């Protein structure tokens, strides 16, 4: 009986471990700034900090069609690919932009051992509420 319980516990632990390895967790997004732009009626600027744990990634997604995005890496490194561009790794202090209507194919922590953080600044229509829309596969 004890052997069965130990085997069941070991199998459960292996199943959880395998599931975690197969599907890394998604990042955490925190809005740090949200303000209308006074001299651009109908436009706002939103700043978000995106944090990925080791090996974390987000599924392919889009941002609002009105959003121009500037991002700079604050910690670690990010593996990024926007449709029509090659995949690239960005390190601390490096930055990139995403044009309105871009499709974000890859957004991942480039490291399996270190966390990664970036600041993304969106300029977009004030009425846009959802910053990320997953692409249905």
Regions found by a protein language model. Name each.
Residues 43, 56-73:
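A short beta-loop-beta micro-motif enriched in histidine and acidic residues
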Residues 127-137:
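Short, low-complexity, Pro/Ser/Thr/Gly-rich segments in the mature regions of secreted, periplasmic
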